[in-house]
């Protein structure tokens, strides 16, 4: 790891981290939050307002994580908060159907044309796990194609060569996943259609589905090559498999219809999360009516959840989606473009080799002079420069994802003042990256 000095301490966060470590493995409830990839003390946040987070030590940061994507309207949006307060006042969970879940499902179906029916769940992991089970039940096949660097939640069969936290910690897979569980997963290089076609030739009549992030953000942002997603769809159609587009990250962030609204490739099944929950645990999977008809109680493929369609989560999600009109997306896209230009200009001025890649308003920086088209390319970056860059920005009150393998996110709340604060911090951060050593 790079030799990095931390310009200030975070004593309250450090105390909380030590308390957490005594009762929680690694002191966190999701590994990348632990700052292991960058070093230092994880910041324990106590509040968020608009584009800002405030930590337990009283320091305020411009937030470029946005809770890993969901907070596209910024923190504590008054209309979302009001919807949540009204829902909580009526009760927090009923264990029955409710109008809120119907309204949220209707909103998703109205926005995303390939989704004819949708099932609500509580996490992106549940959504992808359930979509895979449904694809297997529908096709009566077992094997699944996924791509190295694409992360689809912590599902046993999908953790092979996954991105996100596994990439952050340089883990090829994880203990606890048996050979039998992983044996039906075929892992291929991302953006390689020839490898996909060869896999179908090698396993005729065995592959249930191909699952891919619609535009990956869990190995850093690595967009699909032109024609790649359509090629996946075509290969699936030719071989009787289902094409599953994982839009947990891109869904309702990259456009009103997610990445489908960008590339127009029609999946058989799709998964959603993050933005659709408005900051609450909510996710969904949906797609073709004839496929969804195989789900219980309509069909034989079982899936269930005590808190699926939770009334508070659906109220938050519905409020957020209804606020995401064309003007909101134009705002997020414009802010993202402005920040991307600032980052590139600062790094270029200091002579730092880098590739800034984006998928709509999602983006990340790779510290390399080579194109990044797949997971192997992403792993070739000089991560020690990111560490120095990260800590310089953190010290100046700009909060990035604590990993070079994660997307950055912005919101409609990132105003001129927030952007200026980022602009003011970037020159020193770029110098820190330039001067960093492995």
UniProtKB/Swiss-Prot annotation:
Major enzyme class: isomerase
Pfam families referenced in this protein's UniProt entry, alphabetically: Aminotran_3
One annotated GO molecular function: pyridoxal phosphate binding
Top-level taxon of origin: Bacteria
Record PTM N6-(pyridoxal phosphate)lysine, positions in chain: 274
Gene Ontology CC annotations of this record: cytoplasm
Presence of the UniProt keyword Cell membrane in the record: no
The protein's Enzyme Commission number: 5.4.3.8
Family annotation (SUPFAM superfamilies): PLP-dependent transferases
GO BP term (any one): protoporphyrinogen IX biosynthetic process
Protein name per UniProt: Glutamate-1-semialdehyde 2,1-aminomutase
Subcellular location: Cytoplasm
Keywords noted in UniProt: Cytoplasm, Isomerase, Porphyrin biosynthesis, Pyridoxal phosphate
InterPro entries: 4pyrrol_synth_GluAld_NH2Trfase (IPR004639), Aminotrans_3 (IPR005814), Aminotrans_3_PPA_site (IPR049704), PyrdxlP-dep_Trfase (IPR015424), PyrdxlP-dep_Trfase_major (IPR015421), PyrdxlP-dep_Trfase_small (IPR015422)
Cofactor(s) needed by this chain: pyridoxal 5'-phosphate
Signal peptide bounds: none
Family stated for the protein in its record: Belongs to the class-III pyridoxal-phosphate-dependent aminotransferase family. HemL subfamily.
Catalytic activity, as annotated: (S)-4-amino-5-oxopentanoate = 5-aminolevulinate
Gene3D superfamilies: Aspartate Aminotransferase, domain 1 (3.90.1150.10), Type I PLP-dependent aspartate aminotransferase-like (Major domain) (3.40.640.10)
Pathway given in the UniProt record: Porphyrin-containing compound metabolism; protoporphyrin-IX biosynthesis; 5-aminolevulinate from L-glutamyl-tRNA(Glu): step 2/2
Subunit structure: Homodimer.
């Amino acid at each position: 790891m790079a030799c990095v000095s931390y310009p200030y301490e975070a004593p309250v966060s450090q105390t909380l981290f030590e308390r957490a470590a005594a009762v929680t493995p690694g002191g966190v409830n999701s590994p990348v939050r632990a700052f292991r990839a960058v070093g230092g003390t994880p910041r324990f946040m106590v509040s968020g307002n608009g584009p800002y987070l405030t930590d337990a030590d009283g320091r305020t940061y411009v937030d470029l994580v946005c809770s890993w994507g969901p907070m596209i309207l910024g923190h504590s949006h008054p209309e979302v908060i009001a919807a949540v307060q009204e829902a909580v006042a009526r009760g927090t969970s009923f264990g029955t159907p409710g109008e809120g879940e119907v309204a949220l499902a209707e909103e998703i179906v109205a926005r995303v044309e390939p989704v004819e029916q949708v099932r609500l769940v509580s996490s992106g992991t549940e959504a992808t796990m359930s979509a895979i089970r449904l694809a297997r039940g529908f096709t009566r096949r077992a094997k699944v194609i996924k791509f190295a660097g694409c992360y689809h939640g912590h599902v046993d069969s999908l953790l092979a060569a996954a991105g996100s936290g596994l990439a952050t910690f340089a883990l090829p897979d994880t203990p606890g996943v048996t050979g039998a569980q992983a044996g039906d997963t075929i892992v291929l290089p991302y953006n390689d259609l020839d490898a996909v076609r060869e896999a179908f030739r090698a396993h005729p009549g065995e592959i249930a589905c191909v699952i891919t992030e619609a535009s990956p953000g869990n190995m850093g942002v690595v967009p699909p090559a032109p024609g790649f997603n359509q090629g996946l769809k075509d290969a699936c159609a030719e071989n009787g498999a289902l094409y599953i587009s994982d839009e947990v990250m891109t869904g309702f962030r990259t456009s009103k219809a997610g990445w489908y609204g960008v590339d127009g490739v029609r999946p058989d099944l799709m998964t959603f999360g993050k933005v659709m929950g408005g900051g609450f645990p909510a996710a969904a999977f949906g797609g073709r009516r004839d496929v969804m008809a195989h789900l219980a109680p309509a069909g034989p493929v079982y899936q269930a959840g005590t808190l699926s369609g939770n009334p508070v989560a659906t109220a938050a999600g519905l409020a957020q989606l209804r606020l995401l009109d064309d003007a909101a997306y134009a705002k997020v896209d414009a802010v993202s473009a402005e920040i991307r230009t600032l980052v590139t200009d600062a790094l270029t001025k200091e002579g730092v080799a880098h590739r800034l890649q984006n998928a709509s308003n999602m983006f990340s920086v790779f510290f390399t002079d080579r194109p990044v088209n797949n997971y192997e390319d992403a792993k070739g970056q000089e991560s020690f420069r990111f560490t120095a860059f990260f800590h310089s920005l953190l010290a100046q009150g700009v909060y990035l994802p604590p990993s070079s393998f994660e997307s950055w996110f912005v919101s409609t709340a990132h105003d001129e003042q927030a952007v200026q604060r980022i602009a003011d911090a970037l020159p020193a951060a770029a110098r820190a990256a330039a001067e960093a050593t492995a």
